Regions:
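Carboxylate-rich, polar loop motifs that coordinate divalent cations or form catalytic acidic clusters
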Residues: 1-363
Length: 363
């Protein structure tokens, strides 16, 4: 797709020229995309479960994998270490992993928050809350989004190191079921909402007030799973109806007719080579500012539904999948741009001991 095909929402200012300038500024088009070699990690390689909800690399280069049903796995020096309820996790359904400035690992689960400090699992608070996403702001305050409002109340929580503050619709939070929490370069906190699949749009908190955006303002769909800020300060939102781009004034939309492989966008990333990657229900789409390239199971992915993306410090991209079948799924890994010896480098990460038996599916 050429950026001139960006489609503005009706009744919004046409800002195509500025978006074209944006893409030229920090994205570089590929004339001939190089073929990619995909590798995979599954329960056969030591993962405790194939349903992957989050992947995170910490400051020590360890890779943490949150699974839905198998707990938390950590890949350190080529060996897997698994944490689950037997080790003190509140739940084996792990939804988000982050690291604080002290090097502690915070783990959001479907039943509360844990902290892993020097290998010891500790209680992190919010017991009984069904947590889905979290982030640290510039002040090292932790923002945690809750969903399943009918079970655990929902809402947004902020921990300043001593006390918790809660935000609900009474404080003008757009909804009670929070799918995504993000802090931008200005320190503002953004949330994406679910609301039983209908969504309530996105909210932006500047420390004092909430400003909310829905389809009435130009968002393509009110159910928002993912977001990022690009190098020019534009906000990108992944919804179940496509992508929305907000430059602070105007809204623009990208959908399947523009080149996305699927309109349900669960995760997104700008890599170190200035390429955009989008994980969807139907595979992965890569955008270089002009052209879309998509990858599915036919190209080597372990599963089409991609729930999370990270780029590790060695330049490899990890895609965590969340299939509808417990026998499918796992992690797909690719070197981009392609480099030689990827299979050898991947094998160096895998544990030498025999992998555990396949675990029974989670809920």
């Amino acid at each position: 797709m050429n950026s001139k095909d960006l489609i503005p929402q009706p009744a919004r200012d046409d800002n195509h020229s500025s978006l074209r300038a944006l893409f030229r500024q920090y994205l570089q088009s590929e004339q001939t995309p190089a073929p990619l070699t995909w590798e995979s990690l599954t329960t056969r390689d030591g993962l405790p479960h194939n349903w992957i909800y989050d992947i995170f690399q910490d400051s020590s280069s360890r890779v943490w994998v949150g699974t839905w049903g198998g707990g938390l796995a950590c890949l350190d020096s080529g060996k897997w270490k698994v944490f689950n309820k037997n080790h003190g996790l509140h739940s084996n359904e792990v939804t988000c992993i982050r690291e604080d400035k002290l090097g502690r690992i915070w783990v959001a689960t479907d039943n509360g928050l844990n902290i892993i400090d020097d290998g010891i699992v500790k209680n992190g608070g919010l017991a009984g809350k069904s947590l889905l996403n979290m982030t640290f702001d510039v002040h090292n305050h932790l923002w945690v989004g809750c969903w399943r409002a009918n079970i655990s109340g929902g809402g947004l929580f902020c921990y300043d190191g001593s006390n918790w503050t809660s935000y609900t619709t009474r404080q003008n939070l757009p909804g009670l079921e929070i799918l995504k929490v993000f802090t931008d370069s200005s320190g503002r906190v953004w949330v994406g909402t679910y609301e039983q699949g209908y969504g309530a749009g996105v909210g932006c908190f500047d420390g004092q007030n909430w400003v909310n955006y829905t389809t009435q303002q130009g968002l393509v769909n009110d159910c928002v799973y993912s977001m990022f800020e690009d190098p020019s300060g534009n906000m990108w939102f992944g919804t179940i109806g496509g992508l929305s781009i907000f430059d602070g004034r105007s809204w623009h939309t990208l959908t399947r007719r523009d080149g996305l492989v699927n309109d349900q966008v669960f995760c997104m990333l700008i890599d170190s080579h200035k390429k955009m990657w989008f994980g969807t229900e139907g595979g992965i789409s890569r955008f270089d500012g002009e052209k879309w390239i998509s990858y599915t199971r036919k190209d080597g992915l372990v599963e089409n539904l991609v729930r999370t993306i990270i780029e590790t410090s060695d330049g490899r991209l990890w895609f965590g999948t969340y299939p509808y079948s417990p026998q499918a799924g796992g992690i797909s890994i690719v070197q981009y741009p392609p480099e030689k010896s990827l299979p050898d480098r991947l094998l160096d990460l895998l544990p030498d001991s025999p992998p555990p038996k396949h675990l029974p599916p989670g809920k």
